[in-house]
Design a protein with these regions (language model features):
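Acidic/glycine-enriched connector segments
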Residues: 2-3, 9-122
């Protein structure tokens, strides 16, 4: 399963990202990443540790300006089967990624680190 691992840039806790991945239940065969600091790069590191291929979609800020992150999210959602979002509840980029994944019909797992595991949301 091709899975986007994305989330808040302020997240620096690799254990939280690994927990989100484990709790998602997704059988990941490829990690799709936007390459941003925080969750994206922690997800890439997890993939490398587990010998899972990573496909990066860096935002083209020079070409698209403020819309670059949103365009990247849309491109990732086009090739993915699912999204694991580790979200602080306020990041607009992660909010957009979640909305885009829902719109495209991807399987969805949202992990909010301050919540207990039974409060994590699964959706389609």
């Amino acid at each position: 399963m091709r899975v986007i691992i994305a989330g808040s840039r302020s997240m620096t806790d690799a254990e939280q990202v690994a927990a989100a991945i484990a709790c998602s239940g997704f059988a990941i065969t490829e990690v799709i990443s936007g390459g941003a600091r925080g969750v994206d790069t922690l997800g890439e590191a997890w993939a490398h540790m587990h010998r899972i291929p990573v496909r990066r979609f860096p935002a083209d800020w020079q070409r698209y300006g403020k819309r670059a992150g949103f365009r990247r999210n849309e491109a990732m959602a086009y090739v993915a089967d699912a999204l694991i979002a580790v979200w602080d509840g306020s990041s607009p980029g992660t909010r957009h990624m979640i909305a885009t994944a829902r719109q495209r019909g991807l399987r969805l797992f949202v992990w909010q680190p301050r919540q207990a595991p039974d409060h994590h949301r699964r959706g389609r």
